[in-house]
UniProtKB/Swiss-Prot annotation:
One of its GO terms (molecular function) is peptide deformylase activity. Coiled coil: none annotated. Its cofactor is Fe(2+). Its EC number is 3.5.1.88. Removes the formyl group from the N-terminal Met of newly synthesized proteins. Requires at least a dipeptide for an efficient rate of reaction. N-terminal L-methionine is a prerequisite for activity but the enzyme has broad specificity at other positions. This is Peptide deformylase. It comes from Mycobacteroides abscessus (strain ATCC 19977 / DSM 44196 / CCUG 20993 / CIP 104536 / JCM 13569 / NCTC 13031 / TMC 1543 / L948) (Mycobacterium abscessus). Fe cation binds at C106, H148, H152.
């Protein structure tokens, strides 16, 4: 296992839809997948993240790992991996997100957070690390995480979903940090935690 660099907004791998993880006729997964998943967990844990998509570490495959509580206030923590996820959600509100309840951050936009409109409920179906079907469903923070990580795999960052003044603030943050160009990354444990955990 290894902690690997996390790509920063502007890297093409973050802005390109990922490819499905190949599944053999017998349901088998690639032999090197366990090592990738282990590296993703270690990197996510070192970064104090609640989720990490494969393309955030430069691997353009459709899977993410997570370690997320049900709500912002806590509740049961869920940890796992979803391979080739398919997302369903309730309706996404068209109003401006609440700055207190809808704050969202991303390891690929380190240290920044912005109110982001998300559906209140989400479900993801896919495969677990053993190639068995898995369904995850939740509300609140868990639903937000499912939408956020699946969005990564579709080639979008949460800042791409921002509207109004929040979108303008995110563009300013990207510019002022010198992001938005290929080749930038940060490695958890080698730099201070950008979110101050």
């Amino acid at each position: 296992m290894a902690i690997v660099p996390i790509r920063i907004v502007g890297d093409p791998v973050l802005h390109t839809p990922t490819q499905p993880v190949p599944v053999g006729p017998d349901g088998s997964l690639p032999d090197d997948l366990p090592e990738l998943i282990a590296n993703m967990y270690e990197t996510m844990d070192a970064a104090n993240g609640v989720g990490l998509a494969a393309n955030q570490i430069g691997v353009p495959l459709r899977l993410f790992v997570y370690d997320c509580a049900e709500t912002r206030g806590g509740g049961t923590r869920h940890r796992g991996v979803v391979i080739n996820p398919v997302l369903e959600t309730s309706e996404i509100p068209e109003t401006m997100p609440d700055p207190d309840d809808d704050e969202e951050g991303c390891l690929s936009v380190p240290g920044e957070s912005f109110p982001t409109g998300r559906a209140g409920w989400a479900r993801v179906t896919g495969l677990d690390a053993d190639g068995k079907e898995v369904t995850l469903e939740g509300n609140d923070l868990f639903a937000r995480m499912l939408q956020h990580e699946t969005g990564h795999l579709d080639g979008f960052l949460y800042i791409d979903k921002l509207i109004g003044r929040n979108a303008r603030a995110a563009k300013r943050a990207v510019k002022s940090n010198g992001w938005g160009v290929p080749g930038l990354s940060w490695t958890p444990g080698q730099v201070a935690d950008p979110f101050g955990h």
